[in-house]
C-alpha cells in the first residue's frame, strides 16, 4: 500500500471508523486490509494516538480540578495498575 493510503488508514483508526468504512474511504477491499499487517498496525496506531490524546486532555482537566475528570483519571489509573505486575516482595507477588 502507498504511504498515502497507510496515512489515511491511520487517520481512520484515530477517528474510530469501522474497518468497512475505512476501506471505502481508502478505496481498498477488506481482504486487502486484512492481508496487510502494516495497514492493521497503522489503524491500531491511530486508535492508540487518539486514546492518548483524550487521556492527556482528561489529565489536564483533572489537574485543573474538574471533579468529573478526576474520577475519569482515577479510572485510568486503576486500568493501568492492572497492567503492572506486582513487585518482588509485595503482598500480591506470586510465591516462588
Briefly describe each language-model feature range:
Residues 1-27, 31, 78-96:
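Charge-dense (acidic/basic), low-complexity helical/coil segments
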Residues 2-3, 48-52, 56:
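Amphipathic alpha-helical repeat elements characteristic of tetratricopeptide repeat
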Residues 14-17, 41, 66-67:
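Residue-level recognition of short, well-ordered coil/turn positions
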Residues 34-51:
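Short, solvent-exposed alpha-helical "recognition" segments
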Residues 52-96:
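Amphipathic alpha-helical protein-protein interaction segments
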